[in-house]
C-alpha cells in the first residue's frame, strides 16, 4: 500500500502527521470553494514560478475572509518592490473570490534541500538547462543529507539524455519507510519541458519519525 499511494495523502488526517492544503467548511458550496482554491493555487504557481513555491495553504475561517499562506524559497519575488507584486496578487484574488478580506502571508523555506517540492523543481530546472540527469539527481541527494535528510529517493522518467526510447531512472539513499505512518516523508513532483519532450521528476524525502510533542506540516 505504502509503495503505491501518495506519501503525503497517505498521512493526512487529524491523528496523523500531515495536514490538508485547503481548510474550509461549507455544506452547499463546497465544490465551488474547492474549485476556487485550485484556481488560486494555479494562479500563484504560474505568476511566481521563479520563486520556487513549496506549498500554498488556503484557509477560510468565515464566509467573508480568506487566508493564504505561501511557503517559498525566494519570498522576495512574491513580495516585489515595496510590496507591489503581493498587492497585485491580492487584487486578483479579490476579483476571483468576491471577498474583501484577503490576507496573504509569505513564509521563507530555509531548509529547502529537504523540501520535496523545491528539490523536484530544482532538478527539473537543471534538466531544462541540459544538465545531465544523473548529475542533477546526485547533487540533490548530497545536498539533502547535508541539511538533515535521513533518506531520499529521486526518479526521472522520459527521453533522458535525448534517447529515442523513454525510460525511468532512479536513485535512492538512506532509509525510506513508506509503510510507516509515523514516518515524516515529504513527496512532490515536477515537470521539465525539454526539446525532446516532457521529463517527469518525483522526489521522496524522509525527515525522521513523528514525535508526540511535534507535528509536521
Curated annotation (Swiss-Prot):
Q: Which GO terms describe its molecular function?
A: mRNA binding; rRNA binding; structural constituent of ribosome
Q: Which SUPFAM superfamilies match?
A: Prokaryotic type KH domain (KH-domain type II) (SSF54814), Ribosomal protein S3 C-terminal domain (SSF54821)
What keywords does the record list, in alphabetical order?
Ribonucleoprotein, Ribosomal protein, RNA-binding, rRNA-binding
The family database entries (PROSITE patterns) matched by this protein are listed as:
KH_TYPE_2, RIBOSOMAL_S3
Q: Name one GO cellular component term.
A: cytosolic small ribosomal subunit
Q: Which InterPro entries did the record assign?
A: KH_dom (IPR004087), KH_dom-like_a/b (IPR015946), KH_dom_type_2 (IPR004044), KH_sf_prok-type (IPR009019), Ribosomal_S3_C_sf (IPR036419), Ribosomal_uS3_bac-typ (IPR005704), Ribosomal_uS3_C (IPR001351), Ribosomal_uS3_CS (IPR018280)
UniProt entry tagged with the keyword Metal-binding: no
Ranges where the KH type-2 domain occurs: 40-110
SMART domains in alphabetical order = KH
Which terms under GO biological process does the entry name? translation
Cell membrane listed as a keyword: no
Pfam families assigned: KH_2 (PF07650), Ribosomal_S3_C (PF00189)
Please give the family membership noted in the entry. Belongs to the universal ribosomal protein uS3 family.
Name the job this protein performs. Binds the lower part of the 30S subunit head. Binds mRNA in the 70S ribosome, positioning it for translation.
Q: How does it assemble?
A: Part of the 30S ribosomal subunit. Forms a tight complex with proteins S10 and S14.
- Check the record and name the NCBIfam families matching this protein: rpsC_bact
* Protein name, UniProt field: Small ribosomal subunit protein uS3
Organism, as annotated: Rickettsia typhi (strain ATCC VR-144 / Wilmington)
Amino acid at each position: 500500500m505504502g509503495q503505491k499511494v501518495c506519501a503525503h495523502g497517505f498521512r493526512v488526517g487529524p491523528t496523523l502527521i500531515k495536514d490538508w492544503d485547503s481548510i474550509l467548511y461549507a455544506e452547499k458550496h463546497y465544490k465551488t470553494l474547492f474549485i476556487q482554491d485550485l484556481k488560486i493555487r494555479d494562479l500563484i504557481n504560474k505568476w511566481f514560478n521563479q520563486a520556487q513555491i513549496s506549498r500554498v495553504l488556503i484557509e477560510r475561517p468565515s464566509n467573508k475572509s480568506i487566508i493564504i499562506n505561501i511557503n517559498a524559497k525566494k519570498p522576495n519575488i512574491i513580495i516585489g518592490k515595496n510590496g507591489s507584486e503581493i498587492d497585485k496578487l491580492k487584487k486578483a484574488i479579490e476579483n476571483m473570490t468576491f471577498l474583501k478580506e484577503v490576507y496573504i502571508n509569505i513564509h521563507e523555506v530555509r531548509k529547502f534541500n529537504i523540501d520535496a517540492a523545491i528539490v523536484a523543481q530544482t532538478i527539473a530546472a537543471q534538466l531544462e538547462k541540459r544538465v545531465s540527469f544523473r548529475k542533477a539527481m546526485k547533487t540533490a541527494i548530497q545536498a539533502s543529507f547535508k541539511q538533515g535528510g535521513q533518506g531520499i529517493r529521486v526518479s526521472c522518467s522520459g527521453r533522458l539524455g535525448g534517447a529515442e526510447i523513454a525510460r525511468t531512472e532512479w536513485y535512492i539513499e538512506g532509509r525510506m519507510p513508506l509503510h510507516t505512518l509515523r514516518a515524516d516523508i515529504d513527496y512532490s513532483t515536477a515537470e521539465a519541458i525539454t526539446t525532446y519532450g516532457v521529463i517527469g521528476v518525483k522526489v521522496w524525502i524522509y525527515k525522521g519519525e513523528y514525535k508526540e510533542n511535534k507535528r509536521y506540516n
